[in-house]
Amino acid sequence: MAFVLSLLMALVLVSYGPGGSLGCYLSRKLMLDARENLRLLDRMNRLSPHSCLQDRKDFGLPQEMVEGDQLQKDQAFSVLYEMLQQSFNVFHTERSSAAWNTTLLEQLCTGLQQQLDHLDTCRGPVMGEKDSELGKMDPIVTVKKYFQGIHDYLQEKGYSDCAWEIVRVEMMRALTSSTTLQKRLTKTGGDLNSP
């Protein structure tokens, strides 16, 4: 009995370690969470986007980078994680609480956090030594600049209802792109530890 228990413990440790893959499999649940987050964002619509046309802005979504094949697997994972983290940061603020239906906002933040938690199981093994060697990766800097532009826009517009509506629509674009990136990673086997 002790031998079987030891063997099971060793299997678990190997599977979740840098050489294993169980902790880094991009599951179907991650995709379902992504779809649910998009559905919630759609339901958060309070204003007609047409009534806010004067507030439109091109935030410069790095769509080609996110949806194209420019990124290596570890970079793609990092970009996906950063996009979800920054999306969470946009909606997890005191100012966003005043703009949206609290229940839908909480559900969206919970859904984004669940996606991040799932990806966190991969973060160490995937990022590991490569991240420290690369320092600040250009794709991550691009994503951060994109989201900084969104934060700056909200502040510039005084967090108005129209500004939030424009950002909601933009976040739907961003999360749709991140879902495309998730699909691409899943097609590569979803196992982000594989070579």
UniProtKB/Swiss-Prot annotation:
Subcellular localization, as worded in the UniProt entry: Secreted
Signal peptide boundaries: 1-23
GO molecular function: cytokine activity; cytokine receptor binding; hormone activity
Residue positions with a glycan: 101
Predominant location: secreted
GO biological process: defense response to virus; female pregnancy
Tissue distribution: Constitutively and exclusively expressed in the mononuclear cells of the extraembryonic trophectoderm.
CDD domains named among the record's database cross-references: IFab
Organism superkingdom: Eukaryota
A matching Pfam family: Interferon
Keyword Signal: yes
Intrachain S-S bonds: 24-122, 52-162
Listed InterPro entries: 4_helix_cytokine-like_core (IPR009079), Interferon_alpha/beta/delta (IPR000471)
Keyword Ribosomal protein: no
Keywords: Antiviral defense, Cytokine, Disulfide bond, Glycoprotein, Hormone, Pregnancy, Secreted, Signal
GO cellular component labels: extracellular space
Other remarks on this protein: IFN-tau genes are intronless. They evolved from IFN-omega genes in the ruminantia suborder and have continued to duplicate independently in different lineages of the ruminantia. They code for proteins very similar in sequence but with different biological potency and pattern of expression.
Described purpose of this protein according to its UniProt entry: Paracrine hormone primarily responsible for maternal recognition of pregnancy. Interacts with endometrial receptors, probably type I interferon receptors, and blocks estrogen receptor expression, preventing the estrogen-induced increase in oxytocin receptor expression in the endometrium. This results in the suppression of the pulsatile endometrial release of the luteolytic hormone prostaglandin F2-alpha, hindering the regression of the corpus luteum (luteolysis) and therefore a return to ovarian cyclicity.
Family: Belongs to the alpha/beta interferon family. IFN-alphaII subfamily.
Protein name as annotated: Interferon tau-6
Species per Swiss-Prot/TrEMBL record: Ovis aries
Biological classification of the source: Eukaryota, Metazoa, Chordata, Craniata, Vertebrata
Gene transcribed to yield this protein: IFNT6
